[in-house]
Regions:
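Onset of an N-terminal alpha helix
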Residues: 1-9, 184
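A structural micro-motif
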Residues: 17, 54-56, 77, 103, ...
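Non-catalytic C-terminal accessory region of glycerolipid acyltransferases
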Residues: 90-227
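A short, well-structured juxtamembrane/interface segment
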Residues: 11-31, 168-169
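Catalytic core of membrane glycerolipid acyltransferases/transacylases, capturing the structured
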Residues: 5, 14-15, 27-86, 93-94
Length: 227
């Protein structure tokens, strides 16, 4: 079913969305791999699936499987249904099983669709998966899918995907939340870099220089505190 769905969707995406894919040379051709991508549209998993010549698995809400045609398409493209109330532990266990058998897994670290504007903040699950499985992480940006849908209409729009070099981390059994968070925050800037390369809005920059105290002019010395 995967090959049939891919054979139908890939030429359609190239024609209708003028799909552009950059950095495919960074994608491992075999073995487990985690794709960490930003999430803008329900179309993201479908266009991401065109990157590989093998199935790419990802999480989808169980409600999406209620329509028979959509359930067929989701199953064909590697989606596995989860309940909204399902615990993170169960989802991580399913994701680990996919990677342990040598397959590809698509993860949206933001946890939900984020639009418009800059990318959102990541959750630490992707870092935990990278540590627990030792699978390389390919940072990916998807740009343009948020403009494809207007209401219930699907309209032509340029869609671009950019992959960065894979990131590898030593395998760690039962990593601490702090370590998983640190690895996630090593991965996410690489996703944001691909996003900005495609023209995406960068996140707000924090001024490293502290603000001047009220009433102090630029270049004027600050008043000393009274003893």
């Amino acid at each position: 079913m995967y090959w049939l769905a891919r054979a139908v969707l890939q030429p359609l995406f190239h024609i209708y969305f003028r799909l552009s894919r950059v950095g495919r040379e960074h994608i491992p051709t075999e073995g487990p791999v985690i794709f960490a991508a930003n999430h803008r549209s329900f179309l993201d998993p479908f266009v991401m699936g065109t990157l590989l010549r093998r199935p790419m698995y990802y999480v989808a809400k169980r409600e999406l499987f209620q329509r028979r045609w959509l359930a067929w398409l989701l199953n064909a493209l590697g989606a596995f249904p989860v309940d909204r109330g399902r615990s993170d532990q169960e989802m991580l266990a399913t994701a680990r099983a996919i990677l342990e058998r040598g397959d590809a897994l698509l993860v949206f670290p933001e946890g939900t669709r984020v639009r418009p504007g800059p990318v959102g903040s990541p959750r630490r699950g992707v870092g935990r998966l990278a540590l627990e499985t030792g699978a390389p992480v390919v940072p990916v940006a998807v740009f343009g899918t948020e403009a494809v849908r207007k209401g219930w209409r699907i309209r032509p729009h340029k869609v671009r995907i950019r992959c960065g070099p894979p990131l590898c981390f030593p395998r760690v059994e039962n990593p601490s939340p702090e370590l998983a968070g640190a690895v996630t925050h090593r991965i996410w800037p690489c996703v944001m870099l691909q996003w900005e390369w495609l023209g995406g809005e960068p996140p707000p920059r924090r001024d490293p220089i502290p603000a001047r105290p009220p009433g102090v002019r630029r270049g004027a010395p600050a008043r000393k505190q009274a003893a």
